[in-house]
Amino acid sequence: MSGGVYGGDEVGALVFDIGSFSVRAGYAGEDCPKADFPTTVGLLAAEEGGGLELEGEKEKKGKIFHIDTNALHVPRDGAEVMSPLKNGMIEDWECFRAILDHTYSKHVKSEPNLHPVLMSEAPWNTRAKREKLTELMFEQYNIPAFFLCKTAVLTAFANGRSTGLVLDSGATHTTAIPVHDGYVLQQGIVKSPLAGDFISMQCRELFQEMAIDIIPPYMIAAKEPVREGAPPNWKKKEKLPQVSKSWHNYMCNEVIQDFQASVLQVSDSPYDEQVAAQMPTVHYEMPNGYNTDYGAERLRIPEGLFDPSNVKGLSGNTMLGVGHVVTTSIGMCDIDIRPGLYGSVIVTGGNTLLQGFTDRLNRELSQKTPPSMRLKLIASNSTMERKFSPWIGGSILASLGTFQQMWISKQEYEEGGKQCVERKCP
């Protein structure tokens, strides 16, 4: 291996895509990630004394992290939930390392020093954080080669494009990111906090208005079937530990997220009371057995994504709806490349899986697109590709023969220090 260049397919590179909602990791060249688990981890401040290391738990100086769906779902005394990310960037490094350790030991089941690593990062990631991550991977995990790539670029690659406007609507934010020839155009990034978590908040308010209790499954010992709209008949578990508020909240959110995915739908034209009242209702049963039909509210809640003006409780309400986010972003780019952006608007992120999301977006954009431009929306039909697109893009990229000279090799890192990430990873 002269000069530390790897051969495309036999590298066995790993691809990590760590988002605010879930962690996706696996081998390059495969079509979907091996691991897909919540980024949120349970944190227990351990008492002094011998703690046995259990499945999915990592112990660090008096802290126990509960990672992965199973470990996180066990109710425990005083376990808080936390996330290593803030605004899409790594904030809590200790927690981040616990997630990496878990991924290596339980999902990849291999030693870190055998595999080059390609990681995705937020397009607005800071230089200091990029350097710290590079240092962490080479020093602590001793990996042979490393590369950092912006999520939007990977998403474009996953959809067979090197130029396009990536509209990414995830848990914490919705962003429009222009990509040109595989580079992110920083000046055109537009972010809006109206995304999956915002919709969850709206659902929570709906349940409060309708006086529906959200009871997460962990509290329920037994339930009886009841008539539609009748008060639920369920038994609470007897010996429940004193769970923390943050953990209980997290479990409630899981119920809400299921409701979101099953019931909500984006109206294909701006929301109208009369039209919404005519829509077919959807039946949904809460974990405690309470069940009822949802009609107009199915359309009213997601409307806030596209038209924030009628959402109550948004301060000053200068927020941009999804359609505006796209047009504003394209408007901030050079006039010569706009046709290429309008010609491939790539839709990605778990929140875009709401029924009717792309139809509505298409409709809004066709009204806003200048007549001289051709508009094309690229939205994969498979749930998996939309949720995992940055990962899939990374998997494609890291297994390309032509990419192999792009890696930062361990040798380069040792000679050039952590600054080399700024030079080698755009």
Curated annotation (Swiss-Prot):
One of its GO terms (biological process) is positive regulation of stem cell population maintenance. It holds the Pfam family Actin. One of its GO terms (cellular component) is bBAF complex. Component of the multiprotein chromatin-remodeling complexes SWI/SNF: SWI/SNF-A (BAF), SWI/SNF-B (PBAF) and related complexes. The canonical complex contains a catalytic subunit (either SMARCA4/BRG1/BAF190A or SMARCA2/BRM/BAF190B) and at least SMARCE1, ACTL6A/BAF53, SMARCC1/BAF155, SMARCC2/BAF170, and SMARCB1/SNF5/BAF47. Other subunits specific to each of the complexes may also be present permitting several possible combinations developmentally and tissue specific. It comes from Mus musculus. It is found in: Nucleus. The gene is Actl6b. This is Actin-like protein 6B. Its main location: nucleus. It comes from the Eukaryota. The keyword Methyltransferase does not apply. Restricted to the brain and peripheral nervous tissue (at protein level). Present in virtually all neurons in the cerebral neocortex (layers II-VI), hippocampus (CA1-CA3 region and dentate gyrus), cerebellum (molecular, granular and Purkinje cell layers), spinal cord (dorsally and ventrally), dorsal root ganglion, retina and the olfactory bulb (mitral and granule cell layers). Expressed specifically in postmitotic neurons (at protein level). Keywords: Chromatin regulator, Neurogenesis, Nucleus, Transcription, Transcription regulation. Residues 39-82 are annotated as: Essential for mediating its function in dendritic development.
